[in-house]
Amino acid sequence: MNTSEHVGGAAVASGRLMDALNNNGVKAKMLVMNKESDNITVVGLSGRFRKQLHFLWERWCIFCHLHFHRDHLFEIDIANAGTDITRLREFKEADVIHLAWINQGFISLKGIKKILKSGKPVVWTMHDLWPATGICHYTRGCMAFKNVCQNCRLLPGDGSNNDLSTKIFKRKQELFRRSGIHFVSCSKWLGDQARQSALLTGMGLDVIPNPIDTKLYHPISKHEARLHSMLPEDKRIILFVSQRVTHERKGMPFFIDAINKLVALHPEMKDNTAVAILGSHSDEITGQLSLQSYPLGYVTNELEIISIYNSADVYVLPSLEDNLPNTIMEAMACGVPSVAFKTGGIPEMIDHQKNGYLAKYRDADDLAAGIHWALDEADKDAVAQNCLRKVSANYSQRTVAMKYIEVYNQAAAFKNYKI
């Protein structure tokens, strides 16, 4: 179960996991708030007005707690509204219930309680830290969740000793107690963070990466890719990808700074290198870069996205906090090295100067050095092969599906219910 079918990293990862399971002997369906495709294995909720009401009610409650300021309005989730999915035929037929990213009015804490009362085994994949904190998805260094969330930085005046984060934390604590939920983290980094939470004390937690379909994401001719993507054949391409490229957490200011510093050191790049930016608001960035730029906008067609990755010589993701970015996995599956900050789950993906470059955290100079390494110093063929080997060994559909099947059996055994 995931709020969205396509939008966001958790949606993409959940859809890929469903495909991986179906391709490896498990009959899996994905429940979403709003179905956007004609995929028969995806089920959408009915009741458009009710769904909108759930979404708006949660946002309104958060807005009130923010003293009617929009700051952090979509960084907070309290799960006080959602649909009771236990009445659905698909729920009744299921042997295991698998939660993913279920916020923004999709499933409430009360709804999760009903799921648990059904007696069915529950697995919950964490795509961020929200299941292990009070109200936030990324903690930005705050470690209050180790004991109890309070004095939350996302709330006006840094909250209080009994603020909204405290109340939701305690509701989760009561919900999780003796629940038997089996948690899965997509990265070791996130798993290590989550295990420190007082909410998850004594709970099962495994680390399983997201899968990728290597029959779909694979290297193709750069000439063909650039023709399809309408990108220049006579230049090296630096690629940046994000759902919304101006999102603070994705580190666009560091990308701009690194590119401009690199061009100042190597002015010849103005003639032989360009930047492609994939994601919404990409046209807002081009005027800030010293290189010719191609704003590609928000693209949903997967074949177009694959062509764009294959057009690139290097992929750059200066995220300030990230779990296990799908975009790095996608670039690697196409044989394209990634340059990123050493943070979150990214070091589990990038082997420094083998399949990419790990730059010092928040260091635009080292980010620039990484781009230069990928473009001018690395053995491109060897790096591309290392990328493909990494993906094949760790993120293939079969590898990931087998690990999840083991988790499902563990969760079912805990409920004395073997699948």
Q: In which residue ranges do the predicted regions lie?
A:
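A short, active-site helix/loop in glycosyltransferases that binds the activated sugar's phosphate group
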Residues: T133-Y138, G159-L205, I212-L216, K222
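Conserved donor-binding/catalytic core segment of Leloir-type glycosyltransferases
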Residues: P232-K250, I256-I259
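Nucleotide-activated donor-binding/catalytic signature segment of Leloir-type glycosyltransferases, i.e.
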Residues: H266-T273, G279-I306
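Short alpha-helical donor nucleotide-sugar binding micro-motif in glycosyltransferases
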Residues: S307-A312
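Aromatic "clamp/platform" in nucleotide-sugar-dependent glycosyltransferases that forms part
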Residues: L320
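Short hydrophobic beta-strand element within catalytic cores of glycosyltransferases
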Residues: P337-A340
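Conserved acidic donor-binding segment of nucleotide-sugar-dependent glycosyltransferases
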Residues: H352-Q353, Y357-A364, W373-A378
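A short, well-ordered alpha-helix in the C-terminal region of glycosyltransferases
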Residues: D366, D379-N394, V400-E406
